[in-house]
């Protein structure tokens, strides 16, 4: 069985440390721990790394389409590698959770997250795993766009980093046992 873990974010130095790039940050850490490097796959508008974990093929994917068009990269990769959407996990930022809180879900709506909305639209299914990493709500007077495209202030940086570590620990646990429900039970 082949699995794919996608980290959502925006490409480019300008966005590298923004809240919206929590998925990219978590996937970068996971790739580092698995000792794999990303290579650009231009036809798929993505950075892709691949390896084997417990004898199963694993693809790590960072779409280069910008957040709101992530599905345009993810759907063709699933089709090309013949991966079922149930074996897809998407890591992303979550406005509705406090900074650093990690929540795992097996299916559901986008919850207003435009990258997830794009994946649902292009994949044609809501039945894929999600790892939501909390970034909190905007402070009074700040727009959602400005909030997600800003970095973490000093008091939240460490908490956000802890969330990234927890998300990666959850993914390593999932890759070891292959059971997302069991992973949810342990990490939610």
UniProtKB/Swiss-Prot annotation:
The keyword tRNA-binding applies. Its main location: cytoplasm. The keyword tRNA-binding applies. The record marks 93 as: Stabilizes the basic form of H active site to accept a proton. It holds the Pfam family Pept_tRNA_hydro. It comes from the Bacteria. GO terms for biological process: protein quality control for misfolded or incompletely synthesized proteins; rescue of stalled ribosome. Monomer. This is Peptidyl-tRNA hydrolase. It comes from Lactococcus lactis subsp. cremoris (strain SK11).
